[in-house]
Every structure is written in structure tokens, then in C-alpha cells.
From Swiss-Prot:
Role, per record: One of several proteins that assist in the late maturation steps of the functional core of the 30S ribosomal subunit. Associates with free 30S ribosomal subunits (but not with 30S subunits that are part of 70S ribosomes or polysomes). Required for efficient processing of 16S rRNA. May interact with the 5'-terminal helix region of 16S rRNA.
Record Gene3D superfamilies: 3.30.300.20
Annotated protein name in UniProt: Ribosome-binding factor A
Gene label: rbfA
Similarity-based family: Belongs to the RbfA family.
Amino acid sequence: MAKEFGRPQRVAQEMQKEIAIILQREIKDPRLGMMTTVSGVEMSRDLAYAKVFVTFLNDKDEDAVKAGIKALQEASGFIRSLLGKAMRLRIVPELTFFYDNSLVEGMRMSNLVTNVVKHDEERRVNPDDNKED
């Protein structure tokens, strides 16, 4: 029987917490003026590579998102060095940052469902308005 949480998953969870702390306290890049949240980390099986998924608080502007990802990618060496001090790993993984749009898509889907429910309620209250003669 396989373990439910293997070492890569445990390291990814700890790394997610540590990167969030580093981004909050140590990174002072003006391109990251918006609040940055680490939404997930995926580790390779050999723990040599990590995909870090981030979201930004004010992510309406696509150029700001691209600039934020670029800033994080440029700071990845610094983040790795701080991560090496915070975590006890033989090899600190190479970090690659990706924008996670699942939060934005989830909110969009929620708004669509809310609008459909609202429209359906209006049709139930006023059934005569929707009939055509």
C-alpha cells in the first residue's frame, strides 16, 4: 500500500509555508507591490525542481501579473538561498514560478452560477412575463 503523503508532498507543503513567509518579509521588489499568495507547490520526485504557483491580490491587469512573475523568477536565487537556511534539505530545489488563475476562474464560475440562480428565481416569481403569445 502506497503512503498517502510521500516525501515530495511533505516537502512541498513545508516549502509553500516557507516561501510565503519569505515573500511577505524579505522580498522588497516594487513590482510585487500587490499582495502575493503562494497557492501551491509541486515537487519533482527527486526534490530537485519545484513549481511554485502564486496568485496576486490585484491581478486584474495582465501586465502587472507578468511583471510580478518576472520579478519572482529574477528573485528565485535569493529565495532559494533563504529557503536553504530555513529548511534542512540536501539540495534546495530549483524554483519556477507560475501564475495560478484558479482563484479568478472559481470566482468567475461562482458569479455565473449566482446570475443563473437569480434569473431562475425571477422567472419563477413572474412566469407570465416570460410567455410569448
